[in-house]
Amino acid sequence: MAGRSLTSKAEPTAGAVDRAEKAGGQDTSSQKIEDLMEMVQKLQKVGSLEPRVEVLINRINEVQQAKKKANKDLGEARTICEALQKELDSLHGEKVHLKEILSKKQETLRILRLHCQEKESEAHRKHTMLQECKERISALNLQIEEEKNKQRQLRLAFEEQLEDLMGQHKDLWDFHMPERLAKEICALDSSKEQLLKEEKLVKATLEDVKHQLCSLCGAEGPSTLDEGLFLRSQEAAATVQLFQEEHRKAEELLAAAAQRHQQLQQKCQQQQQKRQRLKEELEKHGMQVPAQAQSTQEEEAGPGDVASPKPLKGERPGAAHQAGPDVLIGQEDTLHPDLSPRGFQEIKELF
């Protein structure tokens, strides 16, 4: 609409310009009239204008009428020019006002675009933050599920360990019952008495053989012939064979007893270690050790102490228990050096 008003108002300005040109033409005609008047005055002074005066007067009248008309047109043109000038000034003011409005609208548009960009960037940032929050929530949910699974597995493992510990504690309690310990002590005592009897029998046999050998040898020593005959006799062979059998049986019995004793000691040590470990685990898990188990711990100074055989006369207490079967065999060798395995081998070679 502003463009249309500007074009509609530009047309009268063009007409005003044409009228201004006409007014300029009238100014030139008035100047010509003045020139003619001067010329007439000059001719009148000279006195050669009589035949042309009327013509000149007519022309002057015409020129004056034209001048009046031109003045009238000039006044109209001036009024029109003033009106157009006022209209032009108003148009200029409207143009300035419209430019101000346009600049304001452009500034508003720029601000709105900036706000729109800020809103878009804020929306994009919020969208990215929402995506990050969703991803973080999903990761936290996964961690929670993993932690729940770990706790469940730990709880199941703890329950299994607790059941195992309770079973082991029950087994230990059954193993350390007074009735069972009494039976074990009785069995060890009986085996000890049997071993002592067999040891006494072997010692008696060895003493008999030693006395027989001493009686055969004599104080000064027998002759080689009698010694050779005796060594080649059936009695010597039977004696050697009997002695070898008794010695082998004694070694087997001693080895079996020592092995049984060692097994019992190892078993007792294992049970004690297991019991101590179970006790530590129970204390670690915050459970109290039963009072009966604590009383049995004081009673069980060690199955090896209970099951250890009594020392023989003239021996230090616990020496037989610490020495084992090898020392007993060595004692037999030291008691009867002549009847050692080397002596048996020499007797066999002589036969």
Swiss-Prot record:
Keywords: Cell cycle, Cell division, Chromosome, Coiled coil, Meiosis, Nucleus, Premature ovarian failure. This is Synaptonemal complex central element protein 1. Residues 1-31, 267-351 are annotated as: Disordered. Belongs to the SYCE family. It is linked to Premature ovarian failure 12: An ovarian disorder defined as the cessation of ovarian function under the age of 40 years. It is characterized by oligomenorrhea or amenorrhea, in the presence of elevated levels of serum gonadotropins and low estradiol. Spermatogenic failure, 15: An infertility disorder caused by spermatogenesis defects and characterized by non-obstructive azoospermia due to complete meiotic maturation arrest. SPGF15 inheritance is autosomal recessive. Pfam families: SYCE1 (PF15233). Residues 1-10 have a biased composition (Polar residues). Major component of the transverse central element of synaptonemal complexes (SCS), formed between homologous chromosomes during meiotic prophase. Requires SYCP1 in order to be incorporated into the central element. May have a role in the synaptonemal complex assembly, stabilization and recombination. It comes from the Eukaryota. One of its GO terms (cellular component) is central element. Residues 52-290 form a coiled coil. It is found in: Nucleus; Chromosome. PANTHER family: SYNAPTONEMAL COMPLEX CENTRAL ELEMENT PROTEIN 1 (PTHR21731:SF0), SYNAPTONEMAL COMPLEX CENTRAL ELEMENT PROTEIN 1-LIKE (PTHR21731). Homodimer. Found in a complex with SYCP1 and SYCE2. Interacts with SYCP1, SYCE2 and SYCE3. Interacts with SIX6OS1. It comes from Homo sapiens. Transmembrane segments: none annotated. One of its GO terms (biological process) is cell division.
